[in-house]
Amino acid sequence: TLKKMYEMYPDDYDITLAMSAQHMKKAEKLMELGLYAEALPHVLFVSQKHVDDNEVNGAAWEKALSCYINMKRYNEALATLDTITLHFPDYENGTLKRAFILDKMDKTEEALQLYLSAIEQSDEDMRIFYVIGYEELAVPYIKKCMEAGATKKAYEESVKLISLNPSSDLGLRYAINSSGLLGKYDEFEKYTAQGINYYPEEPFYQAKRATVLERDKR
């Protein structure tokens, strides 16, 4: 069998490659079943063999990353991601994956910062991609700030979000609510007008506009 041959000739390249393929197949099956802890040793066998084949290595590291994330072993996930980006500088998912992991580690501000620098350096196509990613993390973070009574922080973060995506419905709502609580009436008015502009039929913005008009009468 292949296993016996591998035990006899552990340095034979073709046998190692065949063994690696077998381990990858096993890992795939286990991962499909959600058995990430069981899949991990199979994946690590491949990545630790340093097979002189970038495709094989890349696939093994990708799977290891997925296992670590699903097992909530985030430090190891970050280390694996570092390995991937070192060997594959053009790895496109790097920013998204890193931001996702940082957010899971309660380092959301760091994750948002990562997106901001990616947005600054990206072309138009990738920019949209990163802005969507940014918004996905920013909205729950702003909500968390609001609930914790960190209104100023919530306001700052929602303004950042709107500057990236001016039509962000939730971004605008949080900016309006937080500016109102902070007594920033000019901003309250500005973001209400922006909301009405994008969502003229939306009752939330109409109600806020009524508040603005009421205040102007006084």
Question: Could you say what each language-model-derived stretch is?
Answer:
Residues D14-A18, M24-K25, N57-K63, N93-K97, ...:
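Alpha-solenoid helical repeat scaffolds
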Residues A21, K25, E32, N70, ...:
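Register position in tetratricopeptide repeats
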